[in-house]
């Protein structure tokens, strides 16, 4: 993008940093940078505890537990430790995973919303898009803590926010990803004592995203260590995998007939544990979800039939039972069962019987093949072979389902490089009897804990040391020693190595292999304090607690290889799904021909765990630490001891301590500059990177431009460290709003241009209409006057030439303001024709009538009378009456100049009565009513009659009076009589509208962007001791001299005055002097910034050339000439002795000790005007005391000359005042001889002072221009 620079730009302007946008730590600020309140809009309940454990006052395990307990009992299950999420399983649905809740986390950082798993998912997806880094989430915790549910919700969130509903292929991938949850839960989860939906396998789901749009285009699932032992045996009150109960309870009819499926109580594998039905598990609904997931993923009907055929085969295999024959060997109890199993497997029944009751042994002599023997098995051995067949079938079936799902999810992976990984793996387990499955599960959890330690604790501290960041080291437990105890091979072999060696030594006899393994344990843990050897058992001190493992059967489980007899049996099957898919021919050949030791289960889990660690290390991790609050699986049951134990072994206290002492964000200098260079005008311009220096200096410039305090960051050798997440969020928010602000700036410039064009067009149109058709408001005024012409005395203000009938005086038709508030409050929907304030005469019981203030609003249909009332000490507006215009029969007025009007209806009622009102714009109201209701009668006479109540007439008399009790221009009501002063004759007419004075167009309204207006001074001078009114600021000296005294000089084009002018010189005129000036001189002055390129000049003759400005000297300029003598005020001045509230209509309130003009005295009332002549009205003369003259001492103090020690700014200010005072006095024609002589004598000094002032203003111009965009050629394009 090309850089287009505006002419005359200064370097200071170009490098000025953009204003920091402060929006309350959250997104949602407006384009104009306005501060908006950040609030938690998801829940309105009071925050319980702290949402981030780093905010705890005491960092102890007990304090963490207490905070989690409070939040858990308040149904708040999520808490942060920095960016780590702590989740406590509620064991019930809290309604926090709805689509509405999900949408509230889209595009929000974690501080704007309460802690939630959705916030973690949003953070992962945001960093994937913003930084292009692979993401993963590690969910850890013991079994039943809620890991699987957290993984499901993360998948749901990412699929929802990343998918374009218009792309069918993307939507299909999303649906398939979500469908993997119910499918793999059915085949891989089971009910245990601790968890009704415990994952009995590990799963790492990797969702791949497209470049640019970051939408899911593929996915891949990695499976880890299925607990296949559960297929054949479970402890009491546990269940087999969910799919067996779903299938047997709700099997379709065709499968019942084809596969002979019956209820779960029929099969040994589903009924032995005596737990068929579980509260909270709906097997029927789950089975429908499983079938639906199969269809979404794309499993054909044939593939589904094969799956359920294998499930039926496994169930019927478990029902094969044995008895002892005469030789003590195992024999089939019921041949019908084996025959049906052979039917399902598509093998010969006799071959099946031999495979599970006999064992084939081959002997060899060197390279020669030996003899083959068929050894019969006893009942225990035959049962083990039967179970091995069932476990092998289910394990391979599960692996095939995962591969088949991956085949459907592979999509177009060639376009994908970025991914988000979700790890859902079995949690830490401690049972009464722990075997090989538990040591594998706990080993994987140890590896995950090691990743957490390396990536959050150790790596963080190591990085601080490497980057030379100030840091206080914190001790922590590194569990690498436990991982080495299990997986190491050298120098000290671990448990897995010992298991493999035991199998190699005694491979034929499982019991002998267990004994060898028990002997090797003494060498494994000889020097490891985390290991204890017991007889037939051993203890490993895991990070989550001590676990005792049984040696018996561990070596046999580690073999993880099907017997050769079983593989040969499966090879004879006629079912291609079995022989080609589940058990391909190469399995048997590898088992027979391979000279290498077969891969054991420990080898597989170790290999898978290391691959998982490498995968997670290549991504940016997020962490969710789940906590199980009880063992009863009941809601609102919180076991403090159990939770405290988990807090300790999860290391939450150490995590909090490191988090509070560390940094929330770190990045290399290059990446930080690439991300945030837009935030500084020195590094970025219009989206282009323009920095020429090194990255470290660019980082400093960006942080300086964004006003980030040094306490919030540290700079290392290669990275920048941001301490708090709030600072990072502020930087991200400013970056997000950069282009938005640029667009808003262009829009403002365009709207400003359009506004000027519209205003100019309106001005021309208004002048044209007035020339051709006259002023409609004045025409309507003349129409209203004609209605009363010759019949009613008129008030002086009604006959002004500038009086026009504008109608809506309260601005009810505007979109904002008091008038709009009024109509909204009372529910007026129609356009308003007339609105004004006034009073109404209401009678009170037991006393005479009294005036009450009211608001009058007239529409085309109704005349509304609105009252302001106090309700519970709050002012409210209430509609008192709504009088239909077409029902108004007449209006009554007197012949005098009063403002009373009686509005009479055809049939008055209690809700729509006649009213007797008083308002200044009575004539205009009558004219509007007459215009809307042409049949309206206007009754004018010495009395006015109206119905006080329906059927009860009230007559009000009017009389001319005088005296102290009747203020001028104000009437007095008493006992049914209104007394008023004499008014203007009834035949009076309005003179022509006075011509407006010509003046320069004020363009400041086009640049109102939060700075001071041109009409407002940059500061307010202190009022004098005698007066409270604000001072009037003088006109700029340059304009007065150039206009009045040098008309012969050619005009120099000037630039439009700056929007933000420098402060003018303080005025030292007293209010008395200001009052003596003519009206033209007393108008508000412009700021004291001169027009460009025009220096102030003294008055000179035509033949004399102006003297060049003298050079600057260090000597202080001479003091200004003395002020002119104080002239006599044009009106008598009075001091207020008491406060007066001005409650009477037409009066002016008085403030004690304030000076006022008194224009006229009539009895006990005086016509009072404020010193600034903004208010005029009647006030009691007894409250005032006449002043002899203005305070001379105040004036003398105000005109004190500037001393030689005054600074140049003060000198220039005094000089500006002097020039202005002289010019103003010359304009008024009242220049004294003494002042004229002083001016002539000081001609050269004034020229020097004027030049100095011009130079000072020119220097100041560069500063003020930077803060102003009022120039016509400045379109706010400084990016």
Curated annotation (Swiss-Prot):
- What residue spans carry the Acidic residues bias annotation? 1268-1279
> Where does it localize?
Cytoplasm, Cytoskeleton, Actin patch
User: Which portions of the chain have biased composition (kind: Low complexity)?
Assistant: 1038-1056, 1067-1095
UniProt lists compositionally biased (Basic residues) regions at 1-12
Where is this chain primarily localised? cytoplasm
Which intervals hold domain Myosin motor? 48-736
What modifications follow translation? Phosphorylation of the TEDS site (Ser-371) is required for the polarization of the actin cytoskeleton. Phosphorylation probably activates the myosin-I ATPase activity.
Q: Where is the composition biased (Polar residues)?
A: 980-989, 1018-1027, 1189-1209
* A Gene Ontology term for the protein's cellular component: cell cortex of cell tip
Q: Where is this region: Disordered?
A: 1-25, 980-1001, 1014-1132, 1189-1216, 1253-1279
Q: Which InterPro entries match?
A: Fungal_myosin-I_SH3 (IPR035535), Kinesin_motor_dom_sf (IPR036961), Myosin_head_motor_dom-like (IPR001609), Myosin_TH1 (IPR010926), MYSc_Myo1 (IPR036072), P-loop_NTPase (IPR027417), SH3-like_dom_sf (IPR036028), SH3_domain (IPR001452)
Q: Give start-end positions of Pro residues composition bias.
A: 1116-1126
- Which SMART domains is this protein grouped with? MYSc, SH3
One GO MF term attached to the UniProt entry:
Arp2/3 complex binding
TH1 domain residues are 794-984
- Keyword annotations of the record: Actin-binding, ATP-binding, Cytoplasm, Cytoskeleton, Hydrolase, Motor protein, Myosin, Nucleotide-binding, Phosphoprotein, Repeat, SH3 domain
Q: Where is the SH3 domain?
A: 1129-1189
This protein's domain notes: The myosin motor domain displays actin-stimulated ATPase activity and generates a mechanochemical force.
Q: Give the family per the record.
A: Belongs to the TRAFAC class myosin-kinesin ATPase superfamily. Myosin family.
Functional note: Type-I myosin implicated in the organization of the actin cytoskeleton. Required for proper actin cytoskeleton polarization. At the cell cortex, assembles in patch-like structures together with proteins from the actin-polymerizing machinery and promotes actin assembly. Functions as actin nucleation-promoting factor (NPF) for the Arp2/3 complex.
* Name of the protein in question: Myosin-1
Q: Which organism is it from?
A: Lodderomyces elongisporus (strain ATCC 11503 / CBS 2605 / JCM 1781 / NBRC 1676 / NRRL YB-4239)
Starting at the broadest rank, the lineage of the source organism is:
Eukaryota, Fungi, Dikarya, Ascomycota, Saccharomycotina
């Amino acid at each position: 993008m090309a850089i287009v620079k505006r002419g005359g730009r200064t370097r200071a302007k170009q490098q000025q940093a953009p204003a920091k946008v402060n929006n309350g730590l959250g997104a949602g600020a407006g384009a104009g940078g306005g501060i908006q309140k950040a609030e938690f809009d998801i829940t309105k309940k009071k925050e319980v505890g702290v949402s981030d454990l780093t905010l705890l006052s005491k960092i102890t395990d007990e304090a963490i537990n207490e905070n989690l307990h409070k939040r858990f009992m308040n149904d708040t299950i999520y808490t942060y430790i920095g960016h780590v999420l702590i989740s406590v399983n509620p064991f019930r649905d809290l309604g926090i995973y709805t689509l509405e809740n999900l949408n509230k986390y889209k595009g929000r950082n974690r501080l704007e919303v309460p802690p939630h798993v959705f916030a973690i998912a949003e953070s992962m997806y945001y960093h994937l898009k913003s930084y292009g880094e692979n993401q993963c989430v590690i969910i850890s915790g013991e079994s039943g803590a809620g890991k699987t549910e957290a993984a499901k919700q993360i998948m749901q969130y990412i699929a929802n926010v990343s998918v374009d509903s218009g792309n069918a292929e993307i939507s299909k991938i999303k649906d398939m990803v979500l469908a993997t949850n119910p499918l793999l839960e059915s085949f891989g989860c089971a009910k245990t004592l601790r968890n009704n939906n415990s994952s009995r396998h590990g799963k790492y789901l990797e969702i791949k995203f497209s470049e640019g749009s970051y939408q899911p285009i593929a996915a891949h699932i990695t499976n880890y260590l299925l607990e296949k032992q559960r297929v054949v045996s479970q402890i009491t009150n546990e269940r087999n995998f969910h799919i067996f109960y779903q299938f047997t309870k709700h099997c379709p009819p065709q499968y019942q007939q084809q596969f002979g499926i019956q209820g779960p109580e029929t099969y040994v594998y589903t009924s032995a544990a005596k737990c068929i039905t579980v509260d909270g598990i709906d097997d029927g609904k789950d089975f429908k979800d499983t079938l639906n997931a199969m269809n979404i993923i794309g499993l054909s009907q044939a593939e589904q039939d094969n799956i359920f055929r294998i499930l039926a085969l496994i169930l019927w295999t478990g029902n094969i039972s044995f008895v002892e024959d005469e030789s003590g060997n195992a024999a089939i109890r019921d041949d019908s069962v084996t025959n049906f199993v052979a039917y399902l497997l598509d093998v010969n029944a006799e071959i099946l019987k031999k495979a599970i009751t006999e064992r084939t042994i081959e002997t060899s002599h060197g390279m020669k093949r030996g003899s083959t023997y068929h050894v019969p098995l006893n009942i225990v051995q035959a049962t083990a072979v039967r179970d091995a067949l069932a476990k092998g079938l289910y394990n391979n079936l599960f692996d095939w389902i995962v591969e088949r799902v991956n085949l459907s999810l592979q999509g177009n992976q060639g376009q994908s490089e970025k991914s988000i990984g979700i790890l859902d793996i079995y949690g830490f387990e401690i049972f009464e009897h722990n075997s090989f499955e538990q040591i594998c599960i706990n080993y994987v959890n140890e590896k995950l804990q090691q990743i957490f330690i390396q990536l959050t604790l150790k790596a963080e501290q190591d990085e601080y040391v490497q980057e030379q960041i100030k840091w206080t080291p914190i001790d922590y437990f590194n569990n690498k020693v436990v991982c080495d105890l299990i997986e190491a091979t050298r120098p000290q072999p671990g448990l897995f190595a010992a298991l493999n060696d035991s199998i190699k030594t005694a491979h034929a006899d499982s019991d002998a292999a267990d004994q060898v393994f028990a002997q090797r344990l003494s060498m494994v843990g000889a020097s490891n304090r985390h290991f204890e050897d017991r007889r037939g058992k051993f203890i490993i001190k895991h990070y989550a607690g001590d676990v005792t493992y049984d040696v018996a059967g561990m070596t046999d489980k580690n073999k993880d290889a099907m017997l050769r007899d079983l593989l040969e049996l499966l090879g004879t099957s006629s079912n291609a799904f079995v022989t080609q898919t589940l058990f391909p021919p190469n399995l048997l050949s590898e088992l027979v021909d391979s000279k290498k030791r077969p891969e054991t289960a420990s080898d597989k889990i170790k290999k898978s765990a290391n691959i998982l660690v490498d995968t997670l290390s290549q991504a940016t991790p997020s962490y969710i630490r789940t906590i199980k609050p009880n063992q009863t699986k009941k809601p609102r049951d919180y076991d403090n001891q159990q939770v405290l134990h988990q807090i300790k072994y999860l290391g939450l206290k150490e995590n909090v301590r490191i988090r509070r002492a560390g940094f929330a964000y770190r990045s290399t200098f290059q990446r930080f500059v690439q991300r945030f260079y837009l935030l500084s005008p020195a590094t970025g311009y219009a989206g282009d990177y323009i920095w020429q220096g090194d990255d470290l200096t660019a980082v400093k410039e960006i942080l300086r431009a964004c006003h980030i305090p040094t306490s919030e960051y540290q700079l290392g050798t290669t990275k920048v460290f941001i301490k708090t997440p709030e600072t990072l969020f502020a930087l991200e928010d400013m970056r997000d709003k950069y282009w938005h602000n640029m667009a808003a700036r262009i829009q403002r410039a365009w709207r400003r241009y359009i506004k000027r064009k519209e205003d100019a067009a309106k001005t021309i149109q208004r002048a044209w209409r007035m020339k051709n058709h006259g002023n409609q408001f004045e025409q309507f005024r003349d129409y209203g006057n004609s209605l009363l012409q010759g019949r009613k005395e008129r008030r002086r203000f009604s006959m002004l030439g500038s009086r026009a009938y504008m109608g809506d005086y309260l601005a009810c038709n505007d979109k904002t303001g008091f008038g709009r508030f009024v109509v909204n409050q009372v529910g007026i929907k129609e356009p308003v024709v007339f609105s004004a304030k006034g009073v109404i005469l209401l009678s009170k019981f037991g006393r005479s009538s009294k005036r009450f203030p009211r608001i009058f609003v007239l529409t085309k249909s109704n005349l509304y009378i609105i009252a302001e009332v106090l309700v519970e000490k709050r002012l409210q507006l209430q509609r008192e009456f709504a009088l239909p215009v077409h029902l108004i029969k007449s209006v009554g007025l007197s012949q005098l100049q009063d403002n009373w009007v009686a509005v009479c209806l055809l049939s008055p009622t209690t809700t729509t009565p006649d009213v007797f009102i008083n308002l200044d714009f009575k004539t205009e109201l009558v004219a509007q009513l007459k215009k809307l209701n042409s049949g309206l009668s206007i009754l004018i006479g010495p009395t006015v009659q109206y119905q006080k109540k329906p059927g009860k007439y009230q007559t009000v008399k009017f009389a001319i009076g005088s005296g102290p009790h009747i203020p001028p221009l104000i009437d007095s009501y008493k006992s049914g009589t209104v007394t008023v002063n004499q008014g203007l004759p009834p035949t009076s007419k309005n003179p022509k509208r006075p011509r407006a004075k010509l003046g320069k167009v004020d363009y400041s309204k086009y640049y109102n962007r939060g700075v001071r207006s041109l009409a407002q001074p940059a500061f307010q001078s202190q009022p004098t001791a005698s007066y409270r009114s604000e001072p009037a600021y003088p006109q700029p000296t340059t304009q007065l001299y150039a206009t009045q005294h040098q008309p012969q000089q050619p005009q120099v084009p000037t630039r439009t005055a700056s929007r933000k002018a420098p402060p003018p010189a303080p005025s030292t005129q007293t209010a008395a002097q200001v009052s003596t000036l003519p009206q033209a001189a007393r108008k508000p002055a412009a700021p004291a910034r001169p027009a460009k390129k025009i220096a102030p000049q003294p008055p000179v003759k035509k033949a004399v050339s102006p003297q060049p400005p003298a050079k600057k000297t260090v000597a202080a300029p001479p003091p200004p000439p003395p002020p002119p003598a104080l002239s006599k005020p044009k009106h008598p001045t009075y001091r207020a002795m008491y406060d007066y509230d001005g409650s009477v209509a037409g009066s002016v309130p008085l403030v004690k000790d304030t000076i006022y003009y008194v224009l006229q005295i009539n009895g006990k009332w005086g016509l009072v005007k404020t010193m600034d002549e903004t208010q005029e009205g009647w006030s009691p003369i007894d409250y005032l005391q006449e002043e002899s003259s203005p305070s001379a001492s105040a004036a003398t103090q105000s005109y004190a000359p500037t001393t030689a020690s005054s600074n140049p700014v003060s000198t220039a200010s005094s000089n500006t005042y002097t020039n202005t005072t002289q010019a103003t006095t010359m304009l008024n024609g009242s220049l004294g001889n003494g002042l004229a002589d002083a001016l002539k004598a000081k001609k050269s000094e004034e020229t020097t002072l004027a030049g100095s002032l011009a130079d000072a203003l020119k220097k100041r111009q560069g500063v003020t221009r930077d803060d102003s965009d009022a120039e016509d050629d400045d379109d706010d394009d400084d990016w």
